[in-house]
UniProtKB/Swiss-Prot annotation:
Record's protein name: Multicopper oxidase LPR1 homolog 2
Domain of life, source organism: Eukaryota
Described purpose of this protein according to its UniProt entry: Multicopper oxidase that may play a role in the maintenance of inorganic phosphate homeostasis.
Gene: LPR2
Organism: Oryza sativa subsp. japonica (Rice)
Cofactor mode of binding and number, as noted: Binds 4 Cu cations per monomer. The Cu cations are bound as 3 distinct Cu centers known as type 1 or blue, type 2 or normal, and type 3 or coupled binuclear.
Residues annotated as domain Plastocyanin-like: 285-355
Length: 598
């Protein structure tokens, strides 16, 4: 039934293509010209930038912290990704066109002190990258639609960056869920940790983020962090924002103009992968360091690429937080997997490098991930750390930092307890293909499109168990807005194709799993161990292909543990969403609305 409905919609393609003339399919900067051979770019010639920092709070007389008010715009500007690459046209966040950067400025907020941000759209009438008019997408009469989501933020849905709350330059056009041009309010009443902000416009998220609309956001608690004594200060506590891009020889960003299934989707492809790895806006940069501890807050801001990160010389990462929440105890690893939109907060001690003068951060994850059995991924450099204790330009401040044996107290945050769940939901992940080919046409959650009526209505103050059934060949990083969750277990299905055939024949969502014998398909299936650094509270979790992942999802504040109400009305406004954070999937229906009730 779902396939028939989709094919019926595809009959409208000829009509929908007319929408391309409105927003524009992108000019020559988005797809014409000769693709750059990345081998012609010398690695490690650009220094890793520290993005501009903006204080998300004010300081009143007497040193009292008060709410901060920021105005951050979206601009079309030029950005140098590499010394030998011509400047690239991008969309970027900043306080002006001249100061806008890719990534955007790092917003530094204080726990419990609100940050108000007025987001302004100064983007041009046409997008410079191609987009697909056959997707459910924002398509105004003129201008580039944009809306900002604070990923990991605990905020009212009116400030959450709803995909249909987009707006163009000067608010000339707005989406159906747009309410007012007032500043977004971020209460910052959540644990200290790492967040990021990015575009979230309907059907254009992958394109706008590819163009450069992303940035880091921190929530700090000075008292808590002083007690932890982790590496601190701008020199020793750095954000690393990683993503991949392709370029043309003239420096332009490259995005495909023709899709894998052009008769269905003229431009959309299942995943975007670039051959150039970018860190903080520079291709394969370097960072000069001393032999001491550094804290690295590593965000994977790629559209679809997974990074499996390791350090040359066998250096360790010590994980102190995952996504937006500290772990209970530090977890040492030699390598770890980071999905799109995941954040790993790690400490690296370059004392362990011995006599080495350089350490390379590298990745060996296949693309797409996990790929076919037997695929061997190439190890690619990400950036280089140049160790020089004699460099007078580096801070000589002695290293008094440490990594404590315990990062949070047992009573600080709520403990995961499956017994508190008030109900069980089944969330099934589907990928549909064109008949006669293996090429995807769209991806659904619970066999429903984004525009179908809301089916998930959790109650504030409760927790739920979600069994996420991945019936596809891809690993999908699941993100739930507002909520935090813990992965309790992950089990392989014994016969994915049989279960998928049954469930698709029924045209059902996750609820049809029982009728199709889900437990029988799980019996004897492999149990996957959740990595230690991913056993805490998270807002993104990797759902392996052919598995059922059980999540305990918390629709209430994490701290204090007995909290039941958020500091705002969660039932008001446009509502929240949950989705796959592979942006190409999210833009093609792998996202569902969620309405929280009181």
């Amino acid at each position: 039934m779902e396939k028939r409905r989709f094919l019926g919609v595809c009959l409208l393609v000829a009509v929908l293509v007319l929408r391309a003339a409105v927003l524009g399919r992108g000019d020559d900067g988005g797809g014409g010209g000769r693709l750059l051979d990345p081998g012609k770019l010398e690695m490690f010639v650009d220094e890793l930038p520290d993005m501009p920092r903006m204080r998300g709070y004010g300081v009143a007389e007497g040193g009292k912290l008060v709410a901060g008010n920021l105005t951050i715009g979206m601009y079309e500007t030029m950005w140098k990704f590499h010394r030998d690459l011509p400047a690239t046209r991008v969309f970027a966040y900043g306080t002006s066109k001249e100061t806008a950067t890719v990534p955007g400025p790092t917003i530094e907020a204080m726990q419990g002190v609100p940050t108000y941000v007025t987001w302004t759209n100064h983007l041009p009438p046409r997008h410079f990258l191609p987009w697909d008019p056959t997707l459910t997408a924002a398509a105004p009469g003129s201008g580039v639609p944009a809306v900002v989501h604070l990923h990991g933020g605990v905020q009212h849905s009116g400030s959450d960056g709803h995909s249909l709350a987009w707006f163009t330059a000067g608010f000339a056009a707005t989406g159906p869920r747009f309410s007012s041009p007032a500043a977004y309010e971020y209460p910052n009443q959540q644990p200290p940790g790492n967040l990021w902000y990015h575009d979230h416009a309907m059907g254009l998220t992958r394109v706008n983020i590819l163009a450069g609309l992303l940035g880091a956001y921190r929530v700090a608690s000075p008292a808590e962090e002083a007690a932890l004594n982790l590496p601190s200060g701008e020199a020793f506590d750095r954000n690393l924002v990683l993503f991949d891009r392709d370029f043309l020889a003239d420096g332009s960003l490259f995005m495909n103009r023709t899709g894998n299934n052009p008769s269905v989707h003229p431009q959309w492809q299942p995943e975007y992968f670039g051959a150039v790895v970018v860190a903080n806006g520079k291709a394969w940069p370097y960072l000069r360091v001393r032999r001491r501890r550094y804290r690295l807050r590593i965000l994977n801001a790629s559209n679809a690429r997974f990074f499996r990160l390791s350090l040359s010389g066998g250096l360790r990462f010590v994980h102190v937080a995952s996504d937006s929440v500290y772990l209970a105890r530090p977890v040492p690893t030699r390598a770890f997997l980071l999905a799109p939109s995941e954040i790993a907060d790690v400490v690296v001690d370059f004392v362990e490098s011995g006599n080495a003068t350089a350490i390379v951060l590298r990745s060996d994850a296949p693309a797409p991930y996990p790929g076919d059995p037997g695929d061997k991924a190439e190890t690619v450099p990400v950036m280089k750390f140049v160790i020089d204790d004699d460099d007078d330009a580096l801070s000589t401040e002695p290293d008094t930092s440490s990594v404590p044996a315990r990062l949070t107290s047992p009573s600080q945050y709520a403990k995961p307890d499956a017994r508190e769940a008030v109900l069980m939901r089944r969330i099934a992940m589907y990928e549909y293909t064109k008949e006669g080919t293996d090429e995807p046409t769209h991806l659904y959650l619970n066999a429903r499109s984004y525009m179908d009526p809301v089916t998930e209505t959790p109650r504030e103050g409760t927790s739920e168990l979600w069994d996420v059934i991945n019936l596809t060949d891809d690993n999908h990083p699941l993100h739930v807005h507002l909520a935090l969750f813990v992965a309790l277990e992950q089990r392989s299905l014994r016969d994915v194709d049989d279960l998928k055939e049954c469930m698709m024949a029924r045209g059902s969502g996750g609820g049809g799993a029982d009728a199709c014998g889900l437990e029988r398909h799980l019996a004897g299936g492999r149990k996957h161990v959740v990595p230690k650094q991913e056993r805490g509270w998270k807002n993104v979790f990797k759902v392996r292909p052919g598995t059922v992942t059980r999540l305990l999802v918390r629709f209430r504040p994490l701290s204090p543990p007995d909290s039941r109400r958020f500091p705002f009305d969660v039932a008001a406004g446009p509502g929240y969403v949950y989705h796959c954070h592979i942006l190409d999937h999210e833009d093609n229906e792998m996202m569902r609305p969620m309405k929280i009730v009181r």
